[in-house]
Amino acid sequence: MSARPFADLRERLKSGRASLAAAYREKPRAAHYLARHAALVDALLAELSTRLGLARGICLVAVGGYGRGELFPGSDVDVMLLLPAEPLEAERQALESWVQACWDVGLEIGHSVRTVDACLAEADADITVETNLLEARRVWGATALFDDFGRRFRARFDAQRFFDGKLAEQHARHARFDDSAYKLEPNLKDSPGGLRDLHTIHWLAQACDIDAGWSGIARAGLLTEGEARRVAREERWLAKLRIHLHLLAGRREDRLAFDYQSELAACLGLAPTAHRRAGERLMQGYFRAAKLVQRANDILIQSLRVRLFPVVAPPLPIDDDFQLRAGLLEARDPDVFLRKPDALLRAFLVYARHPQLAGFEPTTLRAVWRASARVDRAFRATPAHRALFIALLREPLGVTRALRAMHRYGLLGRYIPAFGRIVGQMQHDLFHVYTVDEHILTVLRNLRRFTVAQLAHEFPLASRLIAAFDKPELLYLAALFHDIAKGRGGDHSALGALDARGFCRQHGLDKTDTDLVAWLVDMHLVMSRTSQKEDISDPKVIAAFAARVGDTRRLDALYLLTVADIRGTSPTVWNAWKGKLLEDLYHAAFARLQGADLAIAGIAARREEARVNLALYGLPRDAADALWRHLDKAYFARFDARDMAWHARMLWRRDATAGAVVRARLSPAGEGIQVMVYAPDRPDIFVRICAFFARIQYTVLEAKIHTTRNGYALDSFQVMDLAHRNIHYRDFLAFVEYELARDLDPARPLQAVQPGRLSRHQRHHPYPAAVHLEADRGGDGQVLSITCADRGGLLFAIAEELMRHEISVYAAKIDTLGERVEDTFLIRGERLNAPPERAALENELRGVLG
């Protein structure tokens, strides 16, 4: 059918939507927009149905969000054509013409055609259909038919079955988002804490015959009027944000993508501050709203469950104030938190001590929520309350879940105000993927996992150290404060250490323990930076690190916090290589703190261990001598005994080869591969190797470059596939050995690598490239430090630029932190002696890095 007969309706829809959008931008009232938009579509559909002469026995029904009277700018118009009987062919054609006319007018409809019997059968078979029909609203047509449908729908409605189905649906939806509201680009509608969580509450309230809306829920006694107003306010804010997002995108878009965050912030009048982008302020507002929505969802679903499934189990006493009922913690008197303020913290201590508790009974949960809002300076200053908080941290079990519950229901941020300030604060550093508060609690969880004997195989050293640590609660305090000063400007480690010191003193810790916690917070980045940026085979590096640490207790604590911290930044940042570097640094520093002279004992011991290793392979004791006579002391200082033995085995009787020898093996670190290259030295070897690994999309983690006395390059690379592709390693190792040897043939032209593209995250949150050159304190070269956004081919681009400046690389450490890299190179070259040349190199590298 031509759209011409309905051109006026099409224009009414277009101009009506434009008017609504303009009015909304001028004065953003979400409920007003949604209702007016639904009314506009109601009028057009009714007129269209009348013009087309749709049979009056038919009823046009709005369902879903449109049925609720909430029509977002980009949402589909979901309708049902309700029929008194199965349609005849002529009626079917008329209905098809009606649907086509809707599209011609510009209405993107989602439609179904059903009789009442078919509706009820579909509702019984599919809870999504049942939910849509729960919000059915007549738009046009047969009132009697719609009333008959309503009566029959309510008569067969099984509230308990509906409740179970919607709860299972919510669990599945949350699982699609990893049960986390704190994604970098959350879904406004479907993520945990999004609008759909609020819709679920409304649907379940309807199932319990509670009047619609938050005021109805308050009248039913499930929330106070004040609590209902708070939840309604957050619902309006989320709806307002979703309307803006649809208008900006020009279509349905529910993901808070990086592309829109800054513009949305501007729509809401949020400006950047000295330390935070406007988009970051927007996202903190979103995450805080999501947290309140999750809290309301928890409380109300529990309350509605009790209405539908009354608990008949008798309570089991726990103490004078709390009891266990049906697996939930229940206050014997909900007013206990008013009469005994210490009961608020005791509730979570009880929760930690009783792992059989699945959560809090809903009335108790509401009482906790209300009481948490009254935590003030006087509450925090009460000695009994401080003692309870420290007692919670000292519990052998349940600490993580108790602190997470305190956080979820608003108590943790009230008790530690500095923690409250970082709730929902995102970190756009291309490294952390969690908000600061979620990261802190994840680090604490990681520390607690080290204490679980059944998980000791995951991190054996960490498990052994924490089992022997006399006061693990000090580690948990350090975890709580290590990033608590993020977003303030300045050094967050130093500022956090001040906060930690004050908190520890207030909570009665002695000077030794207070000093340790504050020191850990201040130094929490030192061990990771040392292991990943410096040459930890150098005794001078170990001596300097050990001097900063001071004693083995601090070393143990710092190692534990560092491993937990790195593992808590992102699911992808930790790898076995980082673990090996940290363990190697720990053992070397421990030996130094115990009085060992690493410079004297290290090389001789490693050489002897390498000879023993060679003998295990049936090689003579002097098998390494031919190679070793061409190597200087630096080689023996930088490689461990296993690597030295491997090199000697692979190069036995091949130390004067004319071509390249490439050997690869699975990395002894337990992840990735180790590649040895031995070839006549040339300026382009490092560049060619970097090009090869870039082409096969492997990330270089570490490179040790050594030149022998007889003019050969003996290089070792630790590389890893960060995409974790499923490949057959035996074939892959053979491929690397053959193809890399071919690429090192000087007769073959160097194959350039095209630079990879930046991710959307990197484009919208650019990370400024930093290049810094300084003298190597331990040698005669220079240390080149580079920090920038990661992309494919980056190391090749850096290596190519260094070669162009006639600079040799003799060591490289590549630290990939999510979408950011922090690379450190030890370099030499005549041009580095001239300050203008050094400045030119830094500038040209910045150009390469973009």
UniProtKB/Swiss-Prot annotation:
Its EC number is 2.7.7.59, 3.1.4.-. The keyword Metal-binding does not apply. Residues 1-317 are annotated as: Uridylyltransferase. GO terms for biological process: regulation of nitrogen utilization. It comes from the Bacteria. Residues 674-755, 783-850 form the ACT domain. Its cofactor is Mg(2+). Modifies, by uridylylation and deuridylylation, the PII regulatory proteins (GlnB and homologs), in response to the nitrogen status of the cell that GlnD senses through the glutamine level. Under low glutamine levels, catalyzes the conversion of the PII proteins and UTP to PII-UMP and PPi, while under higher glutamine levels, GlnD hydrolyzes PII-UMP to PII and UMP (deuridylylation). Thus, controls uridylylation state and activity of the PII proteins, and plays an important role in the regulation of nitrogen assimilation and metabolism. The keyword Membrane does not apply. It comes from Thiobacillus denitrificans (strain ATCC 25259 / T1). Keywords: Hydrolase, Magnesium, Multifunctional enzyme, Nucleotidyltransferase, Repeat, Transferase. Transmembrane segments: none annotated. GO terms for molecular function: [protein-PII] uridylyltransferase activity; phosphoric diester hydrolase activity. It catalyses: [protein-PII]-L-tyrosine + UTP = [protein-PII]-uridylyl-L-tyrosine + diphosphate; [protein-PII]-uridylyl-L-tyrosine + H2O = [protein-PII]-L-tyrosine + UMP + H(+). The gene is glnD. Has four distinct domains: an N-terminal nucleotidyltransferase (NT) domain responsible for UTase activity, a central HD domain that encodes UR activity, and two C-terminal ACT domains that seem to have a role in glutamine sensing. NCBIfam families: PRK03059.1, UTase_glnD. Uridylyltransferase (UTase) activity is inhibited by glutamine, while glutamine activates uridylyl-removing (UR) activity. This is Bifunctional uridylyltransferase/uridylyl-removing enzyme. Signal peptide: none annotated. Belongs to the GlnD family. Residues 436-558 form the HD domain. Residues 318-673 are annotated as: Uridylyl-removing. InterPro entries: ACT-like_dom_sf, ACT_dom, HD/PDEase_dom, HD_domain, NT_sf, PII_UdlTrfase/GS_AdlTrfase, Polymerase_NTP_transf_dom, UTase/UR.
